[in-house]
Amino acid sequence: MGFEDGFYTIRHLVEGQPPNIPGGMYASSKDGKDEPVTAEPLGPHSKIRWWIARYPEAGEDMYTITEFRVDESIPGQWARPHNEVGGPVYLYDRIRAEETGYVCEWRIQPAYEDVDGVFNIMGNSRIGSTDWADLREEGGKPQVYLKPVPVVPNMYIPRWFISKVD
């Protein structure tokens, strides 16, 4: 199941948390461009919206995640280093991403076949492990980062509840 291009909220689900329980931490761009993507405990009616768009040039289930901007400035996108393990996800525009060697495409796939709205956001893949977007405490604030998860059966993969904003 793929996404239609559009505005979405992106809420982190802690391990064992069902998606239908309200609250939680929503991915945020409040710190601005060239900073790590953080999270805030705001509800689905907040102004934290992301434009998720297909990026078929990069392959199946590949997307870009772009911040919503009300001004005329160039928006930032979720960007990840292609060779760093465990690093933060930054909010870079395409020019900055290319200068730093970061990648702005993400594989977003359903976490379960029978549960709507719950997804895994995959970054880098290498022999033995895959990096997944997750949330951690860094410098006193929640930060989106790349969590390496070994490729073995029954390992928990971080999940996100992604819902369309009308």
Swiss-Prot record:
Entry keyword annotation includes Coiled coil: no
MF annotations from Gene Ontology: cysteine-type endopeptidase inhibitor activity
Domain of life of the source: Eukaryota
Entry keywords, A to Z: Protease inhibitor, Thiol protease inhibitor
Region (Disordered): 20-39
Family the UniProt entry places it in: Belongs to the protease inhibitor I85 family.
Role of this protein: Inhibits papain and cysteine cathepsin endopeptidases, and also inhibits cathepsins B and H, which exhibit both exopeptidase and endopeptidase activities.
Protein name: Macrocypin-5a
